[in-house]
Swiss-Prot record:
HAMAP family, A to Z: GlgB
Catalytic activity: Transfers a segment of a (1->4)-alpha-D-glucan chain to a primary hydroxy group in a similar glucan chain
SUPFAM superfamilies to which the protein is assigned, alphabetical: (Trans)glycosidases, E set domains, Glycosyl hydrolase domain
Single GO biological process annotation from the record: glycogen biosynthetic process
Active site positions, chain numbering: 399 (nucleophile), 452 (proton donor)
Keywords: Carbohydrate metabolism, Glycogen biosynthesis, Glycogen metabolism, Glycosyltransferase, Transferase
Function: Catalyzes the formation of the alpha-1,6-glucosidic linkages in glycogen by scission of a 1,4-alpha-linked oligosaccharide from growing alpha-1,4-glucan chains and the subsequent attachment of the oligosaccharide to the alpha-1,6 position.
Protein name per its UniProtKB record: 1,4-alpha-glucan branching enzyme GlgB
Quaternary structure (record): Monomer.
Length: 738
């Protein structure tokens, strides 16, 4: 045989498991002008048979597992198949051309490949009419990369990939494989260590702890075209989000509902409760239940805990058909240290940020991503685009943005390295977030992005062109913390904390805000929403109804974590369902009905959501009554509107048959909502017809009440509104201004 085929260096590298270019030795090799030779590598095999154009022939055996068969010139990969030791008859992987091209390489290493999810990982495809799976992975520091699985006995020498570029992309087409095949990567590092890794670009995984990657065939037939076409029109509409953890919303026979079971039930529930969107705690694959999904190992894969890849597509499709948008929690800020996943992927910190003395984030004991590497940014960008394109999600909420923006987040002096200007901002992360928002908004108009960001970093929701990060909305963590801090105070102490309610209005229009009562506020000893409220049971439920009304009335989009809408008593736990049996108790029924009607009023009232990021949508009426804990304001749909909503919140426990508010001149005032309604479990007060008082009469009433002296010329010369004010309640009036 021609010595070329037994080139000592090639064979030694192949047998030792360090061959980076098996395609140079294996497959169809030209032997002469008239003859080719099929060269095969079957470690451990004594004989190998080849089916060549319908005839079975035995290949010649050489040393070290090398076999070959001389064939006529011009044979094609489709002309022969090889018998494997398990009896499988399949085409030769090394006879097919490599498809990773120069454009792929340029875009990926530049960090701008917008369809990388169709190129990396395990992609079912046909090459020259032969079906199979194309495997591609980025591992620049590996000596050898193999795909292992049931199809090759998990033997790392059988299917080594070919290194198609000096920048570390490896590829192999394995004919005959279909959806459902399990696989992992086996790598030999520069030091010779053998690593077994799951696929960072894997689209599905087996359950922990095995965590094998699974080939999927994305063939779901969607039925939501009408929703997608109309989606862009909904971006300026009402947004009332129900935050859901899939595994603990509702159980059946001791197990969480799967994606399909959940779909119809949750869609109908959201419609009944007038939620416009659901936001899912991460359904990306993750090894630890207790992480709630926030320690992700499968950035392109729905978790298998609740069903298949197609089942989640069905869930989202069903939500859309019921008119409910789907927002995904997504974690590009850090990833877990589990050795089977991305950490030390090719024997080096490939995805990890390493410039700090300790690579681990002090808050979560996880690795942060290195946004200076274009390939890492492309991995993350591709993940977001995958969920929008292949799973039809309508929004992406980026978790822990603050930890991405600041190099010193959670770290003390000496534990972090400043940027090149000596500052603490992570300039690479800022560029990535700008790229993320720019690409999504250009490619998918109508898809929304949300930032969970807890600092005063400027311009979170300002466009990238104007120097901002480009998010659509920022979670207003300050409003949430101040509001809950106030509500947790017992009633005698609230007058000293009125600024918790008024201060957020100073910055309420500095960004486009979303007002969350999220899962983070009902765990780890923080107590449930109802558990935060002071007083006896009646007062606690009255305060919860007041809180829900306060959130609905405030400027900004809305988010409520599941269970808050009916007064879940226990803290949330991912290991059990919500306490739905509480809905058999009248107090909880009342809160549930109150929440439902508040939501309905919200989505039907443009004053509560139209232009709610503009100062013109809000006007104070009065916040001076600190002693009684009363604040009132007007909400407008546009600056010139005569129609408005008057929102009055009484945070105290007193009852006022006649309470006088200073007000602009009114033509009419009608009560729309009273959270003290007996139907909600309230006292039934506050339903007296409001009286509009002229300035003269209003002044007389103030004098009679001792609010001003009779000869006081500095007193307010304004109209008044005499209302019945119930204890611990939100009142919402429809008013027409003169």
């Amino acid at each position: 045989m021609d010595p070329f085929f037994l080139n000592t260096q090639h064979v030694e590298l192949l047998v030792s498991g360090k061959q980076s270019s098996p395609q140079d030795l294996l497959g169809i090799v030209s032997e002469s002008l008239n003859q080719d030779r099929i060269v095969l590598f079957r470690p451990g095999a004594e004989t190998v048979f080849v089916e060549l154009r319908g005839k079975i022939q035995q290949a010649e055996s050489h040393h070290s597992g090398i076999f070959s068969l001389p064939v006529m010139k011009g044979i094609s990969p489709q002309d022969y198949r090889v018998y494997h030791q398990n009896g499988l008859l399949a085409h030769d992987p090394y006879a097919f051309p490599l498809l990773w091209g120069e454009i792929d390489s340029f875009l990926f290493h530049e960090g701008t490949h917008q369809r990388i999810y169709e190129r990396m990982g395990a992609i079912p495809c046909e090459i020259d009419g032969v079906p199979g799976v194309r495997f591609i992975v980025w591992a620049p520091h590996a000596q050898r990369v193999s795909v292992i699985g049931d199809f090759n006995g998990w033997h790392g020498l059988v299917n080594p990939l070919h290194k198609v570029s000096d920048q570390g992309v490896w590829e192999l087409f394995v004919p005959g494989l279909t959806a459902g095949a399990c696989y992992k990567w086996e790598m030999v590092t520069e030091s010779g260590q053998v690593l077994i890794k799951s696929d960072p670009y894997g689209k599905f995984f087996g359950p922990p702890p095995r965590s094998v990657s699974v080939v999927i065939d994305d063939s779901y037939e969607w039925n939501d075209s009408e929703w997608l076409e109309e989606r862009i029109k909904k971006t300026e509409g009402p947004m009332n989000i129900y935050e859901v953890h899939v595994g603990s919303w509702q159980w059946q026979e001791g197990q969480p509902l799967n994606y399909k079971e959940l779909a119809d039930q949750l869609a109908l529930y959201c419609k009944q409760m007038h939620y416009t969107h659901v936001e899912l705690l991460p359904v990306t694959e993750h090894p630890l239940n207790e992480s709630w999904g926030y320690q992700t190992t499968g950035y392109y894969a729905p978790t298998s805990r609740y069903g298949s890849f197609e089942d989640l597509q069905y869930f989202i499709d069903t939500m859309h058909q019921h008119g409910i948008g789907v927002i995904l929690d997504w974690v590009p800020g850090h990833f877990p240290i589990d050795s089977f996943a991305m950490s030390g992927f090719d024997g080096t910190p490939l995805y990890e940020y390493t410039r700090n003395p300790s690579p681990l984030h002090p808050h979560w004991h996880t690795y942060t991503f290195d946004y200076a590497k274009p390939e890492v940014c492309n991995f993350l960008l591709g993940s977001a685009l995958f969920w929008i394109d292949k799973m039809h999600v309508d929004g992406i909420r980026v978790d822990a943005v603050s930890s991405m923006l600041y190099l010193d987040y959670g770290r003390y002096a000496g534990e972090w390295v400043p940027n090149r200007y000596g500052g603490r901002e992570n300039l690479d992360a800022i560029r990535f977030l700008q790229q993320f928002n720019t690409v999504i908004h250009e490619k998918y108009p109508g898809v929304l992005t949300f930032a969970e960001e807890s600092t005063t970093f400027p311009k979170i929701t300002v466009s990238v062109e104007e120097g901002g990060l480009g998010f659509d909305y920022k979670w207003n963590m300050g409003w949430m913390h101040d509001t809950l801090h106030y509500f947790e105070k017992d009633f005698p102490y609230r007058p000293y904390h009125q600024s918790d309610l008024t201060f957020p209005q100073w910055y309420a229009f500095s960004e486009r805000f979303l007002l969350p009562f999220s899962h983070d506020e009902v765990v780890h000893g923080k107590r449930s929403l109802i558990g935060k409220m002071p007083g006896d049971a009646w007062r606690q439920f009255a305060q919860l109804r007041l809180l829900l009304g306060y959130q609905i009335c405030q400027p900004g989009k809305k988010l409520l974590f599941m269970g808050g809408e009916f007064g879940q008593g226990r803290e949330w736990s991912p290991g059990r369902e919500l306490d739905w049996e509480l809905l058999d108790i009248s107090y909880h029924q009342g809160v549930h009905l109150c929440s439902q009607e508040l939501n309905a009023l919200y989505v039907q009232s443009p004053q509560l959501w139209q232009a709610d990021h503009l100062p013109s949508s809000f006007r104070w009426v009065d916040f001076s009554d600190v002693r009684n804990g009363v604040v009132a304001y007007l909400r407008f749909a546009d600056a010139d509107a005569k129609k408005a909503l008057l929102c009055v919140h009484h945070f105290g426990v007193g009852y006022f048959p006649h309470y006088l508010l200073p007000i602009l001149p009114l033509e009419s005032c009608d009560l729309l909502m009273n959270t003290d309604d007996t139907r909600f479990g309230g006292s039934g007060k506050g339903f007296r017809e409001p009286e509009i008082l002229t300035p003269e009469i209003a002044r007389q009433e103030r004098e009679a009440a001792g609010l001003i002296e009779a000869d006081d010329e500095s007193g307010p010369d304004c109209w008044g509104l005499d209302i019945e004010l119930p204890p611990s309640a939100t009142l919402i009036f429809s008013v027409t201004l003169q």
